Amino acid sequence: MTLRVMHIAELGLRVTELPRAVAFYQEVLGLEIVRAYPTIVFLKAGELDSPLGRGGHPQLLVLFDRKVKLNIALTTVDHFAFEISLEQYQTERERLEQMGLELTERIWQGEYAWLQARSVFFDDPDGNTIELIAHDPNAANEEQTS
C-alpha cells in the first residue's frame, strides 16, 4: 500500500521577534491564534475537511522565538507536517523503520493534548525534519512509549 498524504498539517518557522511576526501574520494574512505560549504561537492557517481539521487540528503556521534555545524533541520547530489517516499510521511507521530511517514517535499529551494526534518524525537526506501526523482522539490517554 502506498502512503497517501492528505494535507500539509503544519509549518514551523523560527522568527526573530515573536510579537512582530504574530502581528504580521494576523494583520496581513488574517490568521487567528489557536494557542499562544511565551516562546511559541500556533496560528490557524485554514480549515481542513479531514479528521485533524474537524477533530481539533486545523492547518497551522507555528512561530518560534529564534532567541530561545529549543529542545527539538519537545517542539515542532523547523519541519513540515503531513496528515495521514490513523488507519495508515502504524503501517507507515513500520515501513519507514524497514527503510532504515531513524524515527521519533510523539503522542501529543499534556499541554498539547488539544491536538488529539500522534506523530512520527524522521529526516530527509538533507536533514529536514518531516512529520507524519494522524488524528487520534484517544492519544492523550495513551502512555508514551518512545
What residue ranges belong to the model's regions?
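Vicinal oxygen chelate
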Residues: 18, 81-126
